[in-house]
């Protein structure tokens, strides 16, 4: 298990990115959270296996249909165990 922080930049707010990310993370069996940033990016922290993270990272590179992803930054974090995958407001 590993915990990774993702920062997704581009047109990622107002396009259902958080809700779509929550659904994708849950479908992959990841736990964690996702939130909008004040600067227009989306940030998430997720815990799961390397394979789960690889699938999520591939999805984040495109995002939902109305999004335009310019960049995804991944940072390894200390392991955190979450209950479910939440949207933070």
UniProtKB/Swiss-Prot annotation:
GO molecular function: acylphosphatase activity
Annotated EC: 3.6.1.7
Enzyme class (EC, first level): hydrolase
Reaction(s) the record says it catalyses: an acyl phosphate + H2O = a carboxylate + phosphate + H(+)
Keyword tags: Hydrolase
Record's keyword annotation contains Nucleotidyltransferase: no
Active site annotation, chain numbering: 18, 36
Residue ranges annotated for the Acylphosphatase-like domain, each copy included: 3-89
Coiled-coil spans in chain: none
Family (UniProt): Belongs to the acylphosphatase family.
Protein name stated in the entry: Acylphosphatase
Species annotation: Saccharophagus degradans (strain 2-40 / ATCC 43961 / DSM 17024)
Source taxonomy: Bacteria, Pseudomonadati, Pseudomonadota, Gammaproteobacteria, Cellvibrionales
Name of the gene encoding the protein in the UniProt record: acyP
């Amino acid at each position: 298990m590993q915990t990774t922080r993702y920062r997704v930049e581009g047109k990622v707010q107002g396009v259902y990115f958080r809700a779509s990310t929550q659904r994708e993370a849950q479908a992959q069996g990841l736990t964690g959270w996702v939130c909008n940033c004040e600067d227009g990016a989306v940030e998430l922290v997720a815990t799961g296996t390397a394979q789960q993270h690889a699938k999520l990272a591939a999805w984040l590179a495109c995002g939902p249909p109305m999004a335009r992803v310019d960049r995804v930054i991944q940072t390894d974090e200390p392991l955190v165990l979450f209950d479910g995958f939440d949207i933070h407001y």
